[in-house]
Amino acid sequence: MLFNFYNKTSAACKSLPAKALSNVRYFQTSPISRKMPLPPVLESRRPKESPEFDYSTLSNYKSFKVKHSQLDVSVDFKKKTISGSVSYEIEKVKKDENTIKLDTSYLKISKVKVDDEDDVKFKLLERKHPLGAQLIVSPSSLPEIFHLCLQFSTTADCTALQWLDEHQTSGKPYVFSQLEAIHARSLFTCFDTPSVKSTYLANIKSELPVVFSGIQTGYDDSTKVYSFKQEVPIPAYLIGIASGDLASADIGPRSKVYVEPYRLKDAQWEFDGDVEKFITTAEDIIFKYEWGTYDILVNPNSYPYGGMESPNMTFATPTLIAHDKSNIDVIAHELAHSWSGNLVTNCSWDHFWLNEGWTVYLERRITGAIHGEATRHFSSLIGWNDLEGSISAMQNPERFSCLVQNLKDGTDPDNAFSTVPYEKGSNLLFYLENLLGGKEVFDPFIKHYFTKFARQSLDTWQFLDALFEFFHDKREILESVDWQTWLFTPGMPPKPKLITDLADDVYALANKWIASAQKFTEREQFEKEFSIKDISEFSSNQIVLLLDTLVQGGMPEKDTFKWSNYPEASEIFTDIYEDKISKSQNAEVIFRNYRLQVKSHITSSYPELAEWLGTVGRMKFVRPGYRLLNEVDRELAIKTFHRFRDSYHPICKSLVKQDLGI
């Protein structure tokens, strides 16, 4: 059957369908006309060309325009492979270029075809970590516009996919992809850079339902082939494929949720009604949603991220299902990517903040518009705490806590991944909003920016040029910004002025507990002073801030206070607030409760945290969870990791190994 399928799909090597090509829309970056140069600190660092070259790809992508792409693949759960062909319609930019250099990583390449030339010569160079193995295609001739087709198969070393057996799911095998940042090259041969965007068609054969980063156009029950289209040009890292025992339900007029059947009712309840509200609010802030549908795939427990912004089909962690809608702001984040990241994209991972900083900023604008400005500021407070924790835990903060990164030496972008581009980036935009005159002044720039760079990839200097160009009448204000600190200096950024209405009661309660821990010696004293009523009206996010503030020693932070000196007080805290904290089903609360207990050296919590780490795959919890265990019981941390390592995504597994030094 697989051989017959290959015969069927290899027809894509002959030519791409005329119908598909009629939908092709290619947008090339337009040069920006600058009336005046930027301040010297920015001009001195300006790259020779914009968008800046992407050093995280081995391809010669600057020589070509990819106008359309097509995937024709088969999912084989027994062999744990995805195989088939990828076809490109390409236009030469450099007329004298006669070889095509592509990205691969742990792929088998069986055949290459250019137009009517079968069995084109190709050479797969030796793999060099982390960028993979360069594929050099050498056709006898290369016309100005040509079709390239490559037949391939993934291997057991593939870093783009996680295969789950029946015992890791509700009973049937499952596979999902995670391609950001440079793992698309491990799924299919490509120009694996966010600088290259194209439209896509996909035909995917699988014995189980399939979802893809596009709109489904058909399903052939006789061949088990699912067909999709993506008419908005996207880079390879945004491709998303998943297949498994999936059911779906409506959660809005243009949205569905896909999930394993046993979770369908809970997932539908969690998201129903809120997604459309997010979409319409985002449309008011930016402009009309361009992708048609917005669906959500809730993956099994091992999914490593909170979400991945695959167009039309957000991939999400099951930790969002908190049974109280308290974590659905993650969906506001992934939805915001429909504009920042997916429509307007960083040209390389050095400028990742253009994706994530804008997205966090827009996410909080969306939730602030729905729930009030105080909610927006409160989310920023929690984000600030996350940023402090992320930077303090970094092994190389001097390098990786700068907003604009430097990965030109071939460093793995995954190693640079942190909350810095998210929180430092969003804080910069929030700072600019207030500096320039507030939302009323800044909002027209939002629409201008996303209109100007729609369907393009850009670098930080293009953002800055657009900013200075738009606010030409406020140049003196923009020149007063400490750009060196914001963009190029490691460490925390300047702290924003935030509305603390929702935080003040939290800070007061945290400080009261810390004072009492140092004063009280008997449980009865605590029980007289505190009760569950203290937090009965707190939202989950307020409880998160309470636990964060307790761990950091109060507000303002007291470095001299250590919970390890007051373990009894910590245990009493957990007992008094059991119904809202210990019994919570919100992973954000669960993790922070374990962190408080571990920091308090409550040894009974160590094996409990270890067991919990076997039930989640989200790196936001897994990585700091293992670091916590490693601080207090290295043997247990390593033993736990070896016990659960096969349940983690390859990216997660690799990074935890680094964290533990094994």
UniProtKB/Swiss-Prot annotation:
Active site: E334 (proton acceptor), Y422 (proton donor)
Sequence positions that bind Zn(2+): H333, H337, E356
EC nos: 3.4.11.-, 3.3.2.10
Main location: cytoplasm
Cofactor: how bound: Binds 1 zinc ion per subunit.
Keyword vocabulary terms for this entry: Cytoplasm, Hydrolase, Metal-binding, Metalloprotease, Nucleus, Protease, Zinc
Gene Ontology biological process terms in this record: peptide catabolic process; proteolysis
CC per GO annotation: cytosol; nucleus
Single GO MF descriptor: zinc ion binding
Cofactors named for this entry: Zn(2+)
InterPro entries given in the database record: Aminopeptidase_N-like_N, Aminopeptidase_N-like_N_sf, ARM-type_fold, LTA4H, LTA4H_cat, M1_LTA-4_hydro/amino_C_sf, M1_LTA4H, Peptidase_M1
Top-level EC class: hydrolase
Subcellular location: Cytoplasm; Nucleus
Reactions this protein catalyses: an epoxide + H2O = an ethanediol
Family stated for the protein in its record: Belongs to the peptidase M1 family.
Chain's role: Aminopeptidase that preferentially cleaves di- and tripeptides. Also has low epoxide hydrolase activity (in vitro). Can hydrolyze the epoxide leukotriene LTA(4) but it forms preferentially 5,6-dihydroxy-7,9,11,14-eicosatetraenoic acid rather than the cytokine leukotriene B(4) as the product compared to the homologous mammalian enzyme (in vitro).
The protein's name: Leucine aminopeptidase 2
Native organism: Kluyveromyces lactis (strain ATCC 8585 / CBS 2359 / DSM 70799 / NBRC 1267 / NRRL Y-1140 / WM37)
